[in-house]
Structures are given as C-alpha cells and as structure tokens.
C-alpha cells in the first residue's frame, strides 16, 4: 500500500493509474478509523480496480477550534488497518498542502439548499467545509466512484446534490450504517464516551427505532412524536441537540406527497455528540 502526503506525488500516481485504464474508488475520511470505515473500503474494492483512502482532518468543517485540536489523529494505526483491508493508496496531506492560501482566502464550494438547514443551521460553515474539501479531493483524485456512510445522512444528500449540480461524472455510493452488537452506530466520537456513558449510548438508536415503528403504523403527529423522543432521551441521560423528521429525498418538512421519511437524531452524551438516522416508508 502506498502512503502519499504531497500533491505532486499523488497526481503522478493517479496519472499512472489512468494511463493503465484503472477504475479508481475514493473513500474520504478524517482518520481515527473504525469498522464502519473498513466497510466503506470493502465496498469500494468491489466497485473499482484501486482504492484511494484520504485521511485529512479538515479544519474548514470544524466550527470550534478545541474540537479540531482534540480530534484523534491515529495515522499509523489507520494505515495498518487499511493495509489489512487491501486499500491501494492512503493520501494524508498537511493542511498547508490542501489550503496553501490559508483558510481565510480559500475558494469555497457551497450547496446552500442543504448546507444551512437542519444540522447546518446549528453548525454554520460546517457543510460548506465538507463540500469544499470533497470537491477538492474529487478534482485531485478523479475517482470513478466514491463511498460515503449513510450515518451522515445530510452530508451524503449534500454530496449527491453537489455532484449533480457540478456535473461530476462520479458514482456516489451510500453504505449502510455499521453498528455495534447493542445497536450503537459506530463513530470516531464514540471514543469520547466514558464506560458508563457507553452503556447508555445504545438508547439513542432504540428510541429512534421506536419512533420509526410508530410512524410505520401510521402516526403522523410529528411535533408530538419529536417531543416524546426528546423526553425519553433526557430521561436516560442524553441532552437532545437536534431531532427532525423530514422528507428523505428533499430534507424538507413532510408533505402529503412524501413517500419516505427520514428521522434525524443528534444528542450529547457527556463530551460526545452522537448522531443517527432511520428511513421510514410512508407508502402504506
């Protein structure tokens, strides 16, 4: 497995693969890799000849400097895991290589229809940072396919829209959320949980699934459902952050024409902000 840190060497390798007619898959990450990331790599391997994994803690998508400073950086362990899963290249650049003019003078790519609603409303600039770095990686690596986790539902929707609007010829693959045996969605931020909090954490998905079941049975009192879920989260020890039920395709409020809903949940447990989502078929 190749480990490349500079843009010229990356371009050279991508050019070589392109000349050889290789199909390239991209898995963008911020490192601190877990089994969920490995599932993305495994999926990418089935769809391409070579798999490029990027490891870059993107400063543009952090609104709090302390969050950026404390984000775990585990490059050596990450590379060992990726070697075992058969990745072909790890691109791990420095921020100065990605943003040579500095963050203040950086050109941005924004998807305003999706970047300022829901989670974007409470995290200003976050999704603009995501779309900017992903478009930059698309330009550098020129993948045929890119794999993203469905756990970050709004992020995946944003990237799909950016690809459609910007005319990228890239197949965007959403990979189902990987969960621990007790139902907790795998996340790099689970490492912030204490032992006691880790026992409580699966309640987030359980409360979400109970809500989804009520909707599947025909319940449509959205405000009441969300209030009940928030109260349940508080009771078990969470601080609810964001709870939404939206049209799965548009991320706008449900209408009579909505065929599928998505439940989007974010809640704090100690120092960890946990997120999860669940699709609900409304066509019954």
From Swiss-Prot:
Major subcellular location class: cytoplasm
Biological processes annotated in GO: pantothenate biosynthetic process
Pfam families assigned: Pantoate_ligase (PF02569)
Pathway: Cofactor biosynthesis; (R)-pantothenate biosynthesis; (R)-pantothenate from (R)-pantoate and beta-alanine: step 1/1
GO CC terms in record: cytosol
EC number: 6.3.2.1
Compartments, as annotated in UniProt: Cytoplasm
Keywords attached to this entry: ATP-binding, Cytoplasm, Ligase, Nucleotide-binding, Pantothenate biosynthesis
InterPro entries: Pantoate_ligase, Pantoate_ligase_C, Rossmann-like_a/b/a_fold
Enzyme class: ligase
Binding site for beta-alanine: 61
Keyword ATP-binding tagged: yes
Gene Ontology terms for molecular function: ATP binding; pantoate-beta-alanine ligase activity
Binding residues for ATP: 30-37, 149-152, 178, 186-189
Residues engaged in binding (R)-pantoate: 61, 155
Note: The reaction proceeds by a bi uni uni bi ping pong mechanism.
Main function: Catalyzes the condensation of pantoate with beta-alanine in an ATP-dependent reaction via a pantoyl-adenylate intermediate.
Oligomer and partners: Homodimer.
Name of the protein in question: Pantothenate synthetase
Originating species: Yersinia pestis
């Amino acid at each position: 497995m190749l480990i490349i840190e500079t843009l010229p060497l990356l371009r050279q390798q991508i050019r070589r693969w392109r000349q050889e007619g290789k199909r390239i898959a991209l898995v963008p990450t911020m490192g601190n890799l877990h089994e969920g990331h490995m599932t993305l790599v495994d999926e990418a391997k089935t769809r391409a000849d070579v798999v490029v994994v990027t490891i870059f803690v993107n400063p543009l998508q952090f609104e709090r400097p302390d969050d950026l400073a404390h984000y775990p950086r585990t490059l050596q362990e990450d590379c060992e895991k990726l070697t075992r899963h058969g990745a072909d290249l790890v691109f791990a650049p420095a921020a100065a290589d990605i943003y040579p003019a500095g963050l203040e003078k950086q050109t941005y790519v924004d998807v305003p229809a999706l970047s300022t609603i829901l989670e974007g409303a409470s995290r200003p600039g976050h999704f603009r940072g995501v779309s900017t770095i992903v478009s930059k990686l698309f330009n550098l690596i020129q993948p045929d396919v890119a794999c993203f986790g469905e756990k970050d539902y709004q992020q995946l929707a944003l990237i799909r829209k950016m690809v459609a609007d910007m005319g990228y010829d890239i197949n965007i693959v959403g990979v189902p959320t990987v969960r621990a045996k007790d139902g907790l969605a795998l996340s790099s931020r689970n490492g912030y949980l204490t032992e006691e909090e880790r026992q409580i954490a699966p309640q987030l998905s359980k409360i979400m699934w109970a809500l989804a079941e009520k909707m599947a049975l025909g319940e449509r009192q959205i405000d009441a459902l969300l209030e009940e879920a928030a109260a349940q989260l508080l009771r078990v020890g969470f601080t609810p952050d964001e709870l939404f039920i939206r049209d799965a395709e548009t991320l706008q409020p449900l209408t009579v024409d909505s065929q599928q809903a998505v439940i989007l949940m974010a809640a704090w447990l100690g120092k960890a902000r946990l997120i999860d989502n669940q699709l609900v078929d409304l066509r019954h």
